[in-house]
């Protein structure tokens, strides 16, 4: 279907440019029966495995190989000392690119994550990347390494710094190859929203085969933010492939939308969800046509809608992209790379996953604040992928002043600067 509702053929070939398409399409939806007992036994086994790996991750420093750290508070700090004990830092300090530890001292395993703020608690959902990293034969041409699917994890925190592991809330299925959550498949970029009408927590997740030819959007729901989530089914929204995704709930209307990388990643689709957030109304639109983007995130600031995403280069980082609009449906005005300074052309060696509103206050004069969350992928050892969290600032740039298109001219653009460490309670300084 086109944005006007008229059927159209997929303009992208099934076998497109491999570098631009880290994901591919497979047609069979499969039997979505859920084997609870065996899946949860598998989850417990994996949790025990995390404990055995803790010492290795806690003491080994790897982040200095991908970024030259610049200290903002101690000029003589060793560049290689990236595993500084938490008691040496302020309780509200975030160190991008370091190993984030949970309250038990274990490395946090929640990649490609999404966040939910509910009843004064933050919840972090993400992909568990553990075990051997390997490249299936079908993925060798574009470097599509992977680990077997374990499930979706959940952590909770009162302050964005101290995270408690709450379990594997959507585990993989080990004994049914036709299931969407089969452990040899893919479940990526989980995003969870709360539906006040149904009092349910709804998770959307990119479902795929290991060669990324399936390209579907899966949905699950729970009565609790810490699960367990019951898997419902997967879709091909608008009868098109759907890869990287995000879910956005409009603050003004509480209408929810699924935003997906579609048509072999050449176009983003915005699809309106039903009132229970688990299906589609049939209203949708194509945006960013021909721009080949993935890792989308959408957020509101005032009366404007902002988009941040990435280009398509597999696990390798590239320059982030941003855009602004007065409507979720567009038109969208691109604002360029929000990252500034050294390593901006690689998004500080990372890829966007979420923008989280974190309330008002701090040194920015009480305005609403936003956290840019990204993943620093390690394609040779995905379990050692790191997290890059940085504050977003807003400023009118020269490009904004020159922009004539609706939705862009004169509006403030999101700006992200690298900081080795920052205080989540009071981090916003002048650009």
Label every model-predicted segment.
Residues 1-14:
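N-terminal targeting leaders characterized by basic, low-complexity, disordered sequences
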Residues 11, 16, 20-27, 36-43, ...:
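Carbohydrate-active catalytic/glycan-binding domains of CAZyme proteins
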Residues 45-51:
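Core hydrophobic alpha-helical transmembrane segments of single-pass membrane proteins
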């Amino acid at each position: 279907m086109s944005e006007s509702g008229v059927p159209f053929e997929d303009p992208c070939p099934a076998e497109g440019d491999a570098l631009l398409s880290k994901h591919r399409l497979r047609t069979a939806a499969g039997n979505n029966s859920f084997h609870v007992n065996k899946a949860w036994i598998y989850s417990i086994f994996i949790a025990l495995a995390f404990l055995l790996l803790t010492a290795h991750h806690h003491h080994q420093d790897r982040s200095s190989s991908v970024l030259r750290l610049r200290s903002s508070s101690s000029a003589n700090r060793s560049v290689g000392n990236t595993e500084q004990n938490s008691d040496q830092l302020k309780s509200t300090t975030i160190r991008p690119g370091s190993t984030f530890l949970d309250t038990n001292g274990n490395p946090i395993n929640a990649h490609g994550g999404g966040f939910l703020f509910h009843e004064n608690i933050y919840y972090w959902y993400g992909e568990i990347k553990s075990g051997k990293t390997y490249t299936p034969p079908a993925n060798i041409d574009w470097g599509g390494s992977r680990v077997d699917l374990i499930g979706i994890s959940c952590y909770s925190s009162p302050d964005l710094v101290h995270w408690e592991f709450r379990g594997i809330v959507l585990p993989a299925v080990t004994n049914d190859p036709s299931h969407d959550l089969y452990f040899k498949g893919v479940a990526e970029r989980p995003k969870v929203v709360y539906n006040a009408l149904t009092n349910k927590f709804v998770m959307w997740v990119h479902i795929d085969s290991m060669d990324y030819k399936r390209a579907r959007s899966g949905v699950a729901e729970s009565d609790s933010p810490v699960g367990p989530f019951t898997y419902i089914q997967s879709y091909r929204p608008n009868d098109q492939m759907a890869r990287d995704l995000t879910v956005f709930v409009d603050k003004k209307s509480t209408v929810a939308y699924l935003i997906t990388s579609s048509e072999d990643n050449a176009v983003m689709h915005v699809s309106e969800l039903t009132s229970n957030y688990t299906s589609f109304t049939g209203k949708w639109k194509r945006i960013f046509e021909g721009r080949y983007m993935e890792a989308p995130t959408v957020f509101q600031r005032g009366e404007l809608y902002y988009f941040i995403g990435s280009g398509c280069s597999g696990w390798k980082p590239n320059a982030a992209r941003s855009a602004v609009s007065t409507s979720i449906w567009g038109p969208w005005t691109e604002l360029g790379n929000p990252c500034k300074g050294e390593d901006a052309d690689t998004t500080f060696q990372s890829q966007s996953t979420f923008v989280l509103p974190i309330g008002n206050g701090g040194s920015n004069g009480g305005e609403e604040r936003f956290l840019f969350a990204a993943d620093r992928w390690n394609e040779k050892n995905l379990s050692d992928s790191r997290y890059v969290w940085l504050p977003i600032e807003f400023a009118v740039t020269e490009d904004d002043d020159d922009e004539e298109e609706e939705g862009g001219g004169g509006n403030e653009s999101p700006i992200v600067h690298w900081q080795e460490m920052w205080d989540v309670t009071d981090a916003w300084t002048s650009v």
